[in-house]
């Protein structure tokens, strides 16, 4: 599936805008994670090489613990490397409809396009809109988010 990055940019916010727009107490939780997390510097140096080639698109909700753990790390990665990180925020479950996971709206309709089941869904896309890979909820194969991102990118580039 090719992804329309221009369309995505119009419907998303930067990761820093997303965190700053959160309501309390969620904003403080995200900011605390951002302030206390230490990036793996060697991995960050390698990720810098891909700043002009890769865009990260993530789906998030303020109430989600895995989002609280990983979206602030994406903000740090973006700041340290120049990688563009775009966020679809405000996802809400739909308890009234067992056949549908997300309530649309307020969840963006892209939850269907990207087949979002669990969050955060972190999608790595090249500048041509080709899907490079994804991380669902948290890193699975590497100990840190930045190492998992680098692993996925290196497998395709």
Task: Say what each PLM segment does.
Residues 1-53, 156-157:
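N-terminal leader/targeting and pre-domain segments
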Residues 51-62:
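Short active-site neighborhood of thiol/selenol oxidoreductases, capturing the structured segment around
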Residues 59, 74, 83-106:
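Thiol-based oxidoreductase modules, predominantly thioredoxin-like and allied folds used
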Residues 64-67, 122:
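The canonical Cys-X-X-Cys-His
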Residues 66-69, 102-103:
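Short, glycine/acidic-rich beta->alpha junctions
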Residues 68-81:
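Typically the conserved alpha-helix immediately C-terminal to a functionally engaged Cys/Sec
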Residues 93-119, 125-128:
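Structural alpha/beta surface segment adjacent to cysteine/selenocysteine redox centers
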Residues 113-157:
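Non-catalytic, surface beta->alpha helical segment in thiol-disulfide oxidoreductase systems
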């Amino acid at each position: 599936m090719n992804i329309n990055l221009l369309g995505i940019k119009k419907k998303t916010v930067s990761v820093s805008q997303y965190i700053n727009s959160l309501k309390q107490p969620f904003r403080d939780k995200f900011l605390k994670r951002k302030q206390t997390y230490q990036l793996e510097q060697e991995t960050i140096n390698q990720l810098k090489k891909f700043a002009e080639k890769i865009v990260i698109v993530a789906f998030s909700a303020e109430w989600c613990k895995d989002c609280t753990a990983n979206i602030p790390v994406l903000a740090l990665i973006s700041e340290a490397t120049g990688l563009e990180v775009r966020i679809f925020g405000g996802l809400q479950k739909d308890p009234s409809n067992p056949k549908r996971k997300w309530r649309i709206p307020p969840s963006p309709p892209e939850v269907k396009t990207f087949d979002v089941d669990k969050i955060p869904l972190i999608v790595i896309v090249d500048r041509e809109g080709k899907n490079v890979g994804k991380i669902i909820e948290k890193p699975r194969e590497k100990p840190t988010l930045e190492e998992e991102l680098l692993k996925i990118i290196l497998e395709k580039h």
